[in-house]
Amino acid sequence: MSKNIVLLPGDHVGPEVVAEAVKVLEAVSSAIGVKFNFSKHLIGGASIDAYGVPLSDEALEAAKKADAVLLGAVGGPKWGTGSVRPEQGLLKIRKELNLYANLRPCSFASDALLKLSPLKSEIVKGTDFVVVRELVGGIYFGDRKEDAGDGVASDTESYSVPEVQRITRMAAFLALQSDPPLPLWSLDKANVLASSRLWRKTVEETIKNEFPQLTVQHQLIDSAAMILVKSPTKLNGVIVTNNMFGDIISDEASVIPGSLGLLPSASLASLPDTNKAFGLYEPCHGSAPDLGPGKVNPLATILSAAMMLKLSLDLVDAGRAIEQAVKNVLDAGIMTADLGGSSSTQEVGDAVAQEVAKLLKN
């Protein structure tokens, strides 16, 4: 069996973290006999420097033909905020590949990390939810008008019933993967916004008509933001929300485990009902241009690779083995500086790769 994976390392620490994830995937390959065909392409600032665009047609076509895509990080001060920006490569690939659902889990890879949270350990212990963010609609892709000298600019938040139904089905599917099903939360601003009223009505009807075994609890986004810092376990389960709210709430959630270096993400183009959804996987952290070589935490990217195995490559057991290996490595105190350790990027990657090999051979 072989799987085709496109690598988009990106900028600054991106190539470093992708290299460690590949190291772990190669350990999986050796242990279980599956072949990974890696194809590397440029994205972001690296692509701008080479081709003048943040994502080349060649890279996009390669991604379309792959089983999955693993991305590092894009951006940095070098490329500024001009008309051609590294982040445009990300927006383009999400839209072109129809990656409509962004999944960002928030949990503790090991209880050894509880002390790193900016919130009290007793408040965050047991936090375990996933934010399901609609990724190709809403205000980020709506009509916009720049200031043309009249001192007025505008952005349009727009959603259709099919767009909301599609992301609701993704959230419901994920909730049903547990027995009993996980709690389902929908976040909106229905007390003010027309688009949120359509969102709430559509989510409610979709769950009632298609997933009668589930109940959805609606929460205003500002209230949810407060709950997240006061009592995050109250939101345990699956949280579904629109593009902008999802962007903000998942960034807020990302500080709960104490380091962005721990949090993976998946962007999917279809339900992972056969564990073969096409997806793009990336760490939640940015390109960290201020970090020197060997300093970045590779675990978010390694855990993104674990999600890739489980959701896109139909290698669920191998994905779980990576997650267990990460826990074992953290429990052993092998950590980068962001977690209070003294290990280098490569040392953490080596430790996880060795642990994965051990787990899969047993």
UniProtKB/Swiss-Prot annotation:
Keywords for the protein's UniProt record, in alphabetical order: Amino-acid biosynthesis, Branched-chain amino acid biosynthesis, Cytoplasm, Leucine biosynthesis, Magnesium, Manganese, Metal-binding, NAD, Oxidoreductase
Pathway linked to the protein: Amino-acid biosynthesis; L-leucine biosynthesis; L-leucine from 3-methyl-2-oxobutanoate: step 3/4
Residues reported in the UniProt entry to bind NAD(+): 76-87, 286-297
Site (Important for catalysis): Y140, K189
GO molecular function terms attached to this record: 3-isopropylmalate dehydrogenase activity; magnesium ion binding; NAD binding
Gene3D superfamilies membership: Isopropylmalate Dehydrogenase
Enzyme Commission number(s): 1.1.1.85
Cofactors named for this entry: Mg(2+); Mn(2+)
SUPFAM superfamilies cross-referenced by the UniProt entry: Isocitrate/Isopropylmalate dehydrogenase-like
Enzyme superclass (EC): oxidoreductase
Matches recorded under SMART domains: Iso_dh
GO cellular component assignments: cytosol
Chain positions recorded as substrate binding sites: R94, R104, R133, D222
Major site of localization recorded for this protein: cytoplasm
Cofactor note: Binds 1 Mg(2+) or Mn(2+) ion per subunit.
Family membership noted in the UniProt record: Belongs to the isocitrate and isopropylmalate dehydrogenases family.
Role description: Catalyzes the oxidation of 3-carboxy-2-hydroxy-4-methylpentanoate (3-isopropylmalate) to 3-carboxy-4-methyl-2-oxopentanoate. The product decarboxylates to 4-methyl-2 oxopentanoate.
Record's protein name: 3-isopropylmalate dehydrogenase
